[in-house]
Amino acid sequence: MNSRILILDCGSQFTQLIARRVREARVYSEIHPPTKSLDWIRAWKPTGIILSGGPSSVTDEGAPTIPPALLDVAPVLGVCYGMQLIAHLEGGSVVGGGRREYGRAEVTVDEASGMFAGFTAGEKTTVWMSHGDHVEQVPPGYVATAHSGNTCAGFRHKTKPIHAVQFHAEVHHSARGAEIIENFLFDICHCAPDWTPGHFIDLEVAKIREMVGDRQVICGLSGGVDSSVAAALVHKAIGDQLTCIFVDTGLLRLHEREQVERTMRAHLGIKLITVRAEDRFLNGLAGEGDPEKKRKIIGHTFIDVFEDASAEAGKNAEFLVQGTLYPDVIESVSAKGGPSATIKTHHNVGGLKPDMKFKLIEPLRELFKDEVRNVGRELGLPEEMVGRHPFPGPGLAIRVLGEVTPHALDVLRRSDAIYLEEIRAAGLYPDIWQAFAVFLPVKSVGVMGDGRTYENVVALRAVTSTDGMTADWYPFPYEVLGRISNRIINEVDGVNRVVYDISSKPPATIEWE
C-alpha cells in the first residue's frame, strides 16, 4: 500500500465523508488536525493532501490554518473552507457576508480538465453548498475552473497540482462528486487503487503476530459485527493463542447464542467460552423500568461477569482485543488540534477496572463500518453475521419498555424473529439500516374467535440511514406489513395488536429507549 491521502480536518461535519469517499475509491486515507507539523506531514509521505471544510472564516482569530510550504509537499485539494484557506494564503481575496449558499446548487464548469476531467466546458452540475464566505478573487498564478452565479466555485494553480472547489464533492447530493474526487486521486495524485480488504488483512496479521509473539490473548465477544470480525482477524494471525469470552445476558435475540457459538467454533475454529449469566442480569433488572437505570445495571453487571470470566480464562493473557473503529479514533477536537478524548492512553477499557492492565489490540481501528463488513466477508464470516443490522449493547432490555420480565422478553424475541424473517424473505433486509420489534407496556382489547382478548401490543420499527445520525422510516409495501402483523398475532401467544412506527430521526430516536 503505497498511495495514501492525508485529510486535514478544519472542522467540517463532512470530514469523515471525505475519508469514506477516498476509501471507496480503494485509496487509503487518514484524518488528522491541521496543527500537525510540516516535518510530521513530510515524514508521513502523503500521495495527496485534502483540506476539509469548516465553520470558521479564514480571517478569524484562531481559525484553522496551515504553513504555506505545505502546498509544495504533495498535490493539494481544498474543499469549501479549504479552498478559501488556499486563496487566503496565496494572496487571493476572501470575503464574508453577501449571498450565502446552503443546500443544493448548480455549478457551471469553466474548464473541463483536472478536477473536472470528463465534463464539458459550460456544463452544469448539481452540487451541495454550505458556505457564507466566498473567494472574490483567485490568487495570482491561479485560474477559475467553475462558478456558481457570479461566485467562484473552483480554481487551480496554473503550474502546480493545487486544486480547490467551493462545494462538498464528498456529499451524495453532489451528483458527480465521486467522479470529481476520483479525478483528484487518480489523474492529479496518480494514486494506485490498492486499499483492499485482502491487503489490509495481510498487513494486520503480520502486525498482530509481531506484537503478540507466543503470548495469550482474550476477546470479549458480543456477537455483533465489530467484535466478531476483530476476533476472526486476530484468530487468523495467532490461532489458538486467542480465547473469546461470550456472555449470554439473557437479553439476546432468538437463537443468538447458538448462532455465535456455531459461527465461532464450528465455522472458524475459535476457542470460545460461553458464560450463562441470564439470571444475574434479570435479577439485577427486576422491578426497574427507567431506561437509563436499566442501561447502568446492565453495564455494571456485564463488567462484573466479564471480569470474573477473564480472571479464570485469561489468567495467562496479556492482551485484550477490542473492536474499536476509525470514527472512535479520530481526534474529537481536531480542527483546533486539541487532545483526543477517544485515543486511549491507558488500559481501562469500556469501564473495566484499572487493575485489569491488558495491552490492547485494536485491529479495526483504521476502518469504517462498511470496511469492517468487507474484511469480515474476506475472512469467511457468513453474511448473516457481517451483514446484520446494528444491535444495542443493552440488548433487548431497551426494546422492552418498562420493566424487563421473562414474559416480555419471550414475546419480544418471537415477534422480532418473525419480523426479520419476513423482511429477509421479501428481499428487503439489505435496504434497511435497522429493523426491530418493541414490546410496549400496554394492553389492548381484541377479539379472537368469539371471545374478547386483552393482550400485549408490539410495535415494529424500520429505518433507512447512512450513519445512524439521521434516519427515515422505511416505506414497507402494505402486503409485507400485513403478512408480518398476521403472523405475529397468530403465532405469538399474548399479542393481539401490531403497530408500525412512522417517526423519523429527528425528532424521534431510532431506538425507543
Swiss-Prot record:
The keyword Ligase applies. PANTHER family: GMP SYNTHASE [GLUTAMINE-HYDROLYZING] (PTHR11922:SF2), GMP SYNTHASE-RELATED (PTHR11922). Its EC number is 6.3.5.2. The gene is guaA. Keywords: ATP-binding, Glutamine amidotransferase, GMP biosynthesis, Ligase, Nucleotide-binding, Purine biosynthesis. The keyword Isomerase does not apply. Residues 195-388 form the GMPS ATP-PPase domain. PROSITE patterns: GATASE_TYPE_1, GMPS_ATP_PPASE. GO terms for cellular component: cytosol. It catalyses: XMP + L-glutamine + ATP + H2O = GMP + L-glutamate + AMP + diphosphate + 2 H(+). It comes from Gemmatimonas aurantiaca (strain DSM 14586 / JCM 11422 / NBRC 100505 / T-27). ATP binds at S222, G223, G224, V225, D226, S227, S228. Residues 4-194 form the Glutamine amidotransferase type-1 domain. One of its GO terms (molecular function) is GMP synthase activity. Gene3D superfamilies: 3.30.300.10, 3.40.50.880, HUPs (3.40.50.620). The active site is at C80 (nucleophile), H168, E170. This is GMP synthase [glutamine-hydrolyzing]. Pfam families: GATase, GMP_synt_C, NAD_synthase. InterPro entries: Class_I_gatase-like (IPR029062), GATASE (IPR017926), GMP_synth_C (IPR001674), GMP_synth_GATase (IPR004739), GMP_synthase (IPR022955), GMPS_ATP_PPase_dom (IPR025777), NAD/GMP_synthase (IPR022310), Rossmann-like_a/b/a_fold (IPR014729).
